[in-house]
Design a protein with these regions (language model features):
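PAS-family sensory domains
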Residues: 2-12, 161
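PAS-associated C-terminal cap
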Residues: 11-21
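Catalytic-core segments of nucleotide cyclases and related cyclic-nucleotide turnover enzymes
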Residues: 16, 116-123, 127, 131-133, ...
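Conserved nucleotide-binding and Mg2+-coordinating catalytic segments in signaling enzymes
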Residues: 20-39, 56-70, 78
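Short regulatory alpha-helical coupling segments
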Residues: 20-21, 34-50, 81-89
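Hydrophobic framework residues that shape the active-site pocket
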Residues: 61, 80, 94, 102, ...
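A short pre-motif secondary-structure segment
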Residues: 93-96, 137
Length: 183
């Protein structure tokens, strides 16, 4: 029967779409995953498309897991993912790279000043407490960014620059926290 064959083809297409979606997304947050991140960067580099890469690592995430448990930690990661999705345009990308590490790819040319403002806005947005299971849960974020091709035409170098800036930001955040605890 022709209708049955068409229905089977449509079902197979749906299954293929589902499998592809599962292969490209993080199962917990629904964000795109590291595998897809690597592929997008390769395509952008091959076509010399300008972008800003933001790396983000959560601060104080481990104490949340230790204090409230992994279920609350998972809900927190989902909340962070939702906030990240809310701060990008529809043409941009948000990724969970693993653990409490995230990345954003903002497509098109950008300036250092625009990136610095965006980074500050992301960090402020992530720092707003999350209401999870009746608890106000707070984390911070350390971010770093780099511009392609403005800072390097080598995507690996752009990744290193963003990672180094994130690390420096994390060190500065720890120093501020240590100073605040001493007051």
């Amino acid at each position: 029967n022709r209708l049955t064959r068409v229905m089977m083809i449509v079902q197979d297409m749906g299954k293929q779409h589902l499998l592809q979606s599962l292969a490209n997304t993080d199962g917990l947050t629904g964000l795109l995953n590291k595998r897809y991140f690597d592929r997008v960067l390769t395509v952008l580099e091959q076509h010399s498309q300008p972008f800003a890469l933001f790396y983000m690592d959560l601060d104080r995430f481990k104490p949340v897991n230790d204090t409230y448990g992994h279920d609350v930690g998972d809900k927190l990661l989902k909340g962070v993912a939702q906030r990240l999705q809310g701060c990008i345009r529809s043409r941009d990308y948000a990724f969970r790279l693993g653990g409490d590490e995230f990345a954003l790819l903002l497509l098109g040319p950008m300036t250092q000043e625009t990136c610095a403002r965006k980074m500050d806005m992301i960090c402020e947005m992530i720092a707003v407490p999350y209401e999870i299971d009746g608890n106000a849960v707070s984390v911070g974020a350390s971010c770093g960014y780099a511009l392609y091709p403005a800072e390097s035409v080598d995507v690996q170098q752009v990744r290193c620059i963003a990672d180094q800036r994130m690390y420096e930001n994390k060190q500065a955040n720890h120093a501020r926290q240590d100073g605040a605890e001493g007051i």
